[in-house]
């Protein structure tokens, strides 16, 4: 099985965001997440038609999966006071914004959240690629 290195940030963006008129693809040779939109759409789609086995379309996940990941992550936080803040953030309107805001004040936990989310998203993708002999390694980004 060969290993494909994929940017955590790029994969999360592709799998969690719904940008009208944009479709995201994973290049299964390079690990690059390739957006097809507006000005580059024809060029990217021509490349995909030429090498269809090289590209995998990345469909955004259902919104509920993001909420479920937040609930699961909050349970893993060892500091009771932060766990309580996160649990409060995931009830009521604006859960995604409130959850992110609470974590941004805790850089170490925010980084752990990014990796946790990446692993959740990659889990679905791993299953799709295993049949082709491809394993995914998430590469953390420095931001």
Predicted feature descriptions by range:
Residues 66-122:
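Amphipathic protein-protein interaction modules
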Residues 116-143:
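Acidic, proline/glycine-rich low-complexity IDRs
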Residues 34, 41, 64-66, 107, ...:
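Residues in flexible loops and secondary-structure boundaries
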Residues 2-91:
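The feature represents the first ordered module of a protein
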């Amino acid at each position: 099985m060969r290993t494909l290195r994929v940017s955590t940030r790029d994969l999360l963006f592709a799998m969690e965001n719904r940008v009208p008129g944009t479709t995201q693809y994973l290049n299964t040779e390079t690990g690059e997440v390739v957006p097809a939109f507006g000005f580059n759409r024809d060029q990217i789609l021509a490349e995909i038609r030429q090498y269809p086995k090289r590209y995998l379309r990345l469909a955004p996940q259902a919104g509920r999966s993001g909420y479920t990941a937040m609930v699961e992550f909050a349970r893993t936080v060892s500091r009771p006071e932060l766990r309580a803040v996160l649990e409060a953030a995931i009830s009521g309107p604006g859960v995604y914004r409130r959850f992110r805001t609470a974590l941004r004040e805790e850089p170490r936990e925010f980084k752990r959240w990014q990796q946790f989310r990446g692993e959740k998203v990659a889990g679905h993708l791993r299953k799709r690629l295993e049949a082709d002999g491809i394993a995914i390694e998430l590469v953390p980004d420095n931001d």
